[in-house]
């Protein structure tokens, strides 16, 4: 019997291998991978690469920021942009601010995404109010509903947790089976420097990069690793930007700890020099900020040797006007600018061009860093993140020689920090669950076709079962620590 759809004659790549084969699709799933398949419909992939659709596990969509600014993208514009860039699954954040009821927060985000998303999605939680109700009732309920990861902040006045609160959240994650993601920067260092810069009249965006020091990231990463070790809680450090931070993660992993690292396009392709262009430098302001060429090289090494586990966009789109980056127009100080840069659409093409095409990484590593490890880490594998029999037919067919110069993207930020860069390689046909949703730059997906993905427990979030000496001593005394 003929299959519904066959992707014919392409070069298939997974995280393990690259090979020539047809990919046969029945309904929403991949059902056969071999040569000479017959289908009612075919996609000619001769001379092209057939890759898993990207999984972006760090993006901010229709979310109020820690500074109280709404992201420029809703779930429609963001997922349309993602799809055009070859990403077929996103895991954005449901943000709890202080005083927010976690159940209501999650309900609100479900309603937003259900009505608008054109690709499949999961959720992380942002925990800013770790009271007893949140930790003992609301969080366990959310985890059981398939939201198995949450993010905490060590900086931002509205969001940051102190060390005891972080330990409370980690203990809950360990009990319930969830992964803790950490924005690791030392709040005191940043706040102290920023206060003095503003007082001295140094208000331009370039001072943002000065205040968010390399040391503030390194210290916070080292500290949160120690906290996680105390309660045996796996953690993932998001948007790592410094050689010192990467080395702290590398050292922890060398010691057998479950500490994962993530980096993003802005730390591979931007530097602090991009910010130093007057007020327009706000376009490049994110936290932590881009660093220098040496830090870029450290990030590339981390991706190559595994210290950095995944490559995400940290898509945080804010317009260059009073609604986003410049709430006070040209009087806006760096402390008042919304932090973040758009990146959902260009995450994959940038890494393809400057990673794979320039031989910094292999094609298999490209797939691993952009899709497979995300799915494995966050409980979506093997349904997502690979090309395999039984997997969802989330596939991007890439023309590896297609050349273009970045001018604009399909998100709602109104700018891209990568404008003017040349790309070689672009996804020309994108499928989500067997449906062609993008072809040659044209969208054919209906608003709201995306589905929520309840995530399963993954190997990444399982505790090691390893104790620090003091916890072992408590057991020896028959007075074990109660998490």
Range-by-range predicted roles:
Residues 10, 28, 47, 58, ...:
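Divalent metal-coordination and catalytic microenvironments
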Residues 103-119, 168-182:
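Alpha-helix-loop-beta-strand connector modules within alpha/beta enzyme cores
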Residues 205-234, 281-283, 309-310, 317-402:
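His/Asp/Glu-enriched, well-ordered alpha-helical/loop segment
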Residues 45-116:
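Metal-associated gating/positioning segment near the N- to mid-region
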Residues 59-73, 122-135, 210-214:
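Active-site mouth loops of central-metabolism enzymes
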Residues 325-333, 389-453:
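C-terminal cap of metal-dependent C-N hydrolases
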Residues 136-311, 316:
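Histidine/acidic residue-rich metal-binding segments in metalloenzymes
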Residues 1-53, 67:
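Histidine-rich, glycine-flanked metal-binding segment
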């Amino acid at each position: 019997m003929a299959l519904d759809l066959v992707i014919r004659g392409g070069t298939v790549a997974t995280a393990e291998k690259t090979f020539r084969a047809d990919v046969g699709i029945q309904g929403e799933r991949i059902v056969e991978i071999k040569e000479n398949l017959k289908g009612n419909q075919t996609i000619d992939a001769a001379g092209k690469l057939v890759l898993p659709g990207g999984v972006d596990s760090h993006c901010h969509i229709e979310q109020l920021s820690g500074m109280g600014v709404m992201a420029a993208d809703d779930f429609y514009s963001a997922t349309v942009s993602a799809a055009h860039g070859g990403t077929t699954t996103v895991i954005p954040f449901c943000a709890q601010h202080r005083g927010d009821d976690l159940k209501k927060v999650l309900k609100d985000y479900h309603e937003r995404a259900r009505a608008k998303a054109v690709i499949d999605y999961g959720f992380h939680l942002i925990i800013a109010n770790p009271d007893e109700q949140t930790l003992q009732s609301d969080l366990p309920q959310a985890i059981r509903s398939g939201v198995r990861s949450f993010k905490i902040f060590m900086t931002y006045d509205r969001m940051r947790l102190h060390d005891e609160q972080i330990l409370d959240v980690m203990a809950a994650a360990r009990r319930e089976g969830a992964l803790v993601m950490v924005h690791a920067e030392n709040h005191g260092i940043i706040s102290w420097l920023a206060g003095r810069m503003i007082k001295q009249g140094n208000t331009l965006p370039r001072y943002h990069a000065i205040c968010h020091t390399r040391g503030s990231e390194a210290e916070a990463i080292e500290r949160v690793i120690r906290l996680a070790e105390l309660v045996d809680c796996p953690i993932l450090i998001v948007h790592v930007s410094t050689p010192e931070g990467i080395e702290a993660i590398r050292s922890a992993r060398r010691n057998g700890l479950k500490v994962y690292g993530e980096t993003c396009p802005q730390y591979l392709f931007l530097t602090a020099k991009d910010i130093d262009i007057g007020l327009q430098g706000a376009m490049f302001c994110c936290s932590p900020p881009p660093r220098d060429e040496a830090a870029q090289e450290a990030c590339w090494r981390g991706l190559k040797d595994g210290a950095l586990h995944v490559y995400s966009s940290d898509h945080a789109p804010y317009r260059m006007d009073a609604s986003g980056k410049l709430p006070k127009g040209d009087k806006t100080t760096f402390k008042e600018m919304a932090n973040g840069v758009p990146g959902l659409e260009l995450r994959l093409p940038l890494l393809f061009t400057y990673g794979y095409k320039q031989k910094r990484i292999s094609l298999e590593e490209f797939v691993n860093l952009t899709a497979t490890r995300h799915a494995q880490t966050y409980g979506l594998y093997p349904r997502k993140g690979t090309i395999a029999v039984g997997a969802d037919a989330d596939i991007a067919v890439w023309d590896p020689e297609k050349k273009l110069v970045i001018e604009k993207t399909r998100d709602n930020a109104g700018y891209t920090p990568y404008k003017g860069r040349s790309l070689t390689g672009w996804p020309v046909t994108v499928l989500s669950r067997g449906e062609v949703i993008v072809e040659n730059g044209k969208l054919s997906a209906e608003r709201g076709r995306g589905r929520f993905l309840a995530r399963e427990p993954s190997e990444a979030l399982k505790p090691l079962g390893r104790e620090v000496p003091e916890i072992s001593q408590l057991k020896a005394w028959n007075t074990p620590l109660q998490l």
